[in-house]
């Protein structure tokens, strides 16, 4: 049982108050030693989580040589932003136009004013750089868009693999871009396209060297083929096994990250933007008992604990962009004061101001008890949150550091 008063005292001793990016310098320096810095968020609709991550990202790129940003977004739409950032997209006159490539719900996660400002900054930064900083999506959802991109690229270079790509694409055509329909058919009626997408991915990987006239176009095609293969598996599993589909998704994100890291070279470093539920080590939560893994765990296992620096984010209260049901219109919702005895509550009790904590060997054991830690998704019911929005977590094992913003406000999305 958590002794709240004791926890509050520990936080007072080890937390550092901050008001601006300059105050975060010790945290940024500590994070910069890693190959990958994972920046979380407690919701997908909080302005301050985006703006704080953007400021940390700029510092890591400008002062510590980080090579790219990879986010919890679709690869094809993010690649349009990447093209704009690198000056390769004359059809977009500004970042907002490039971000209108995000069509899939919830588009607000990336088509918003906060991301626009970061994308414009990255473009301006790249103007004076030989090695261009990139912006990529790690998610698995873009099955049809990724298949289209593969077919178009193989047609453009007259590759003999185009027939396999078209065959795979045609296999998905009867499902009218409805992934749930495909998942049901694959799971219950044996109407799977797995062999077609696996065959295509294998062919593309075997012929990788023949696509290298334009290395980034080759990367784009290879990751789109990877998305198609893993999305097929994801939607297949989603219907029958939610935990397994989660694992397929997070393993895909780490695979995509590996492709990007290989493209930028062995010395490259990346900044990753994802929800806390992805970047905070699953082994330090109740996910582990469910047999679930996530990006935080998988990257630590793959690259080593010292090469991954995960920063969780949280708030005591505020407003947020979310929806009442999957696919419904977004709205501004209240974020109630944190539940008594939760992590966000005790951090707030330690001082009603913004603060950060770094978990080190000296203080780690003070924060190893299990405590409820708020997680808000794209679907949110504030009045019900005490029943399902607090993840039992051992904070100092889940993250390397934590940023608490006491009162937060809703993101500024584009409506289109």
Model-inferred region functions:
Residues 1-416:
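Structured catalytic-domain cores with a bias toward divalent-metal coordination
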